[in-house]
Amino acid sequence: MPLSSARAAAFDILLRVERESSYASELLHADTYNRLSDQDHALTMELVMGVLRWRSRLDAEIAPASSQPLSKLDVEILIALRLALYQFRWLDRIPKRAALHESVELVKRARKRSAAPFVNAVLRKLSTAAPQSTPEPDSAEAIASTLAHPAWLVERWIHHYGLAAAAEICRHNQRIPPTTIRLRSPTAESELNAQGIKLKPGSLLASARRVLSGDITTTRAFRQADIVIQDEASQLVAILIGRAQGEVRILDCCAAPGGKTLAIADQNPTAEITAVEIHPHRARLLQNLVSGSKHNIGTVVADATNLPFTSPYHRILADVPCSGTGTLSRNPEIKWRLKPEDLSDLHTRQRAILRSALAQLSPDGRLVYSTCSLEKEENEDVVEEILAQDNSIHLLDCRSELDLLKNAGDLVWPVPASLTRGPYLRTIPGIQPCDGFFAAILEKDS
């Protein structure tokens, strides 16, 4: 029996995620795997994301069936075991014997032939064993165990958001996230409908649509950037920049892959926009996206902690690199990589970027500081530290800006204030139907 292309691809991707700290979502859309048939690509994605989402639950079940501690197993062996067990427990349509056989073959293919009998024995035990019972998620320990999250993260979320919200965040992270797009052309929606793409209106923004069925990546609208794949919270953060009057200069400090840059440009079509990205390969992705637009967007490869510009900007977006804990439904590997001490390192860099960006801001200018993190160290703590050190900067209450967006028809969420915590924008996955984002609006005195 030939080895399944989908399982081989899933194994390879999971191995790269472990060894190279790659992101599964990026690998799944690499040319190598895009050559798979639609059916095989869908199964590959299901296997990869399922194993990453439920990793700790899988390991907790594998451990008692293994004669060796999991920490002693080669990564290839552990990945093969996780792949098979995920299929046993979550993919009823796949016969257990097929999943077992293919994981044994994957180990042989990975040049671990001597481990094949061990893998076979462990999986035979697991294939006949009843699934482990899981506790109701009514405590930090139970949420972490049942919903497969690190306990330290769950404990933080309970502290900051409450037990019920923490459980909802974790439930949300374990679901397949929807594909959401931003419409950039007045004809894009009707064009997609004519091609059999089914859409429904977004929950937060008038420009957003959720894709119910169909492959938008094959459409002319996608190729021409008449639509952009972008979560609604990400869209909302970008338009907090506001519609500036007259000829203005706008800076996007950490711009790749470019969705927010385009949203800002669409809102400010006459602006001169500079999009900065530190990594050359990501800057190329950014350039490819914005090059087809009619906007005046220049891309610059530079470090946002030391911006090289001499003329000030009227509007700045500082969407800084962060832990990404608001996007775990899309990037589940993050929860297994992140360590508590990482938050301090991120805080230091984020503070440096915000300082550098504020130095570029003109008097009476506006800066939006944002992350896709749920962690206080990366959000309020960064902003409040800067405010305490610079009397020329003040905080604008996000609620007033959301009310303006609501009155203009851009925001369709019924209760704008529910998107805030104090003066800050805060979306919570599972509480709102979007990723978790934070934003603060800062203004410089004249």
Where on the chain are the PLM-derived regions?
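S-adenosylmethionine
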Residues: 1-446
